[in-house]
Curated annotation (Swiss-Prot):
Keyword Heme: no
Organism: Yersinia pestis
EC number of the protein: 6.1.1.2
Identification of the protein by name: Tryptophan--tRNA ligase
Function: Catalyzes the attachment of tryptophan to tRNA(Trp).
Location in or out of the cell: Cytoplasm
Length: 342
C-alpha cells in the first residue's frame, strides 16, 4: 500500500465515527450525521466507520460486511463529502489497534471499571462480557488521539469516555512531553435529541430491542408512518400541544423531531398546532419524516449500488488516515523507547 503524505490544515481537527452494528436511526442522523455534514467547511473532519468497536458484541460476519458498506453509503447519502472529509473504515488503519495497545499500558484497571457504559453493556450482553468490551474506551481514546484531534462531537453516553481519553493523553504527555493534543468536546449550537417513540424518557437507540421505539434511516416510509402514529403522547383532555419535557415528554419529542426535520422553531410549531388534536401533530411528523427519508433513501441506493465508488472512497480514505496516523504512532513509539523499524 502506497501511503500519501499527510495533509496539513489550519482548521481544527474533528474526529467522530459510528458503528456498523445496526441500522442507523433518525436520532443518529439529526443528532450526529447532519452536524458532521455542517462541520465540513469549517473543520478538518475525519469520519470513521468503527468496525473494531462493533465486534465487542457478537456479529454475523456477512452481516457486518454488508452493514459496513451500508453505513458508508449512508454517510455519503447524508452529505459527507470525501473531497472535504477523510472517510474510512477503522480496521483498514492498523495504527488504531497499535496505539490502543500502547495506551492500555498507561490506563488503569480502576478507571475502566468505573465506566458506566461497561456496566450497562455487561448487563445487556451478560453471556459475552469480553475483554474488548471492558477495553472499549481505550480504543476510543486511540481513535481520537491518533489524529491529534482538537474537538470530538459526543453525546451524553460518550462524555465519560472522552474524559478518559483526555486523562490518558495528559498522563502520557506528563511522562514524555507534548505528544498528544488534549481533545475538547464539541458542543453544537443546536442539535435534536431524539427520544424513544414509546418511552420518550429515554434516548432513541439503534440497539433497542423494541423496534417500535426506533425509526431507522433505511426503513420503509410506510412503516415509519405507522410507528409515529402509535407514538406516545399523553392523556390530556382536551389535547394540549405544548413543549414541556418534564410533563409532556411524548409531545415534546414529536415537536423536537418535527422541528429538526422542517427547521421550524418550537414556538412556531406550538402556535401552528394550537387547539389541534394529537393526531394532527402525529400526521405532520409522519409526513415530514417519511418525506425526508424517501429522499435520503433514493440517494443511498445510488451510492450503495456503485460498489466501485465505495471501494475507491474506502481506499483513498484509509490512505489519507494512515498517512496521519503513522506520524503520531512514530512519535509515541519513539517516546516509549521502541527501536524504529529499519
Amino acid at each position: 500500500m502506497v501511503l500519501s503524505k499527510p495533509t496539513v490544515s489550519s482548521k481544527p481537527i474533528v474526529f467522530s465515527g459510528a458503528q456498523p452494528s445496526g441500522e442507523l436511526t433518525i436520532g443518529n442522523y439529526m443528532g450526529a450525521l447532519r452536524q458532521w455534514v455542517q462541520m465540513q467547511d469549517d473543520y478538518d473532519c475525519i469520519y470513521c466507520i468503527v468496525d473494531l468497536h462493533a465486534i465487542t458484541a457478537r456479529q454475523d460476519p456477512a452481516l457486518l460486511r454488508k452493514r459496513t458498506l451500508d453505513t458508508l453509503a449512508l454517510y455519503l447519502a447524508c452529505g459527507i463529502d470525501p473531497k472535504k472529509s477523510t472517510i474510512f473504515v477503522q480496521s483498514h488503519v492498523p495504527e488504531h489497534s497499535q496505539l490502543s495497545w500502547a495506551l492500555n499500558c498507561y490506563t488503569y484497571f480502576g478507571e475502566l471499571s468505573r465506566m458506566t457504559q461497561f456496566k450497562d453493556k455487561s448487563a445487556r450482553y451478560a453471556e459475552n462480557i469480553n475483554a474488548g468490551l471492558f477495553d472499549y474506551p481505550v480504543l476510543m481514546a486511540a481513535d481520537i488521539l491518533l489524529y491529534q484531534t482538537n474537538q470530538v462531537p459526543v453525546g451524553e453516553d460518550q462524555k465519560q469516555h472522552l474524559e478518559l481519553s483526555r486523562d490518558i493523553a495528559s498522563r502520557f504527555n506528563n511522562l514524555y512531553g507534548d505528544i498528544f493534543k488534549i481533545p475538547e468536546p464539541f458542543i453544537p449550537k443546536a442539535g435534536a435529541r431524539v427520544m424513544s417513540l414509546q418511552d420518550p424518557t429515554k434516548k432513541m437507540s439503534k440497539s433497542d430491542d423494541n423496534r417500535n421505539n426506533v425509526i431507522e434511516l433505511l426503513e420503509d416510509p410506510k412503516s415509519v408512518v405507522k410507528k409515529i402514529k402509535r407514538a406516545m403522547t399523553d392523556s390530556d383532555e382536551p389535547a394540549l400541544i405544548r413543549y414541556d419535557v418534564e410533563k409532556k415528554a411524548g409531545v415534546s419529542n414529536l415537536l423536537d423531531i418535527l422541528s429538526g426535520v422542517t427547521g421550524q422553531s418550537i414556538p412556531e410549531l406550538e402556535a401552528q398546532f394550537t387547539g389541534q388534536m394529537y393526531g394532527h401533530l402525529k400526521g405532520a411528523v409522519a409526513d415530514a419524516v417519511s418525506g425526508m427519508l424517501s429522499e435520503l433513501q433514493e440517494r443511498y441506493r445510488t451510492y450503495r449500488e456503485d460498489e466501485a465508488l465505495l471501494q475507491d472512497v474506502m481506499r483513498e480514505g484509509a490512505a489519507k488516515a494512515r498517512a496521519r496516523a503513522q506520524v503520531t504512532l512514530a512519535k509515541v513509539y519513539e517516546a516509549i523507547g521502541f527501536v524504529a523499524q529499519p
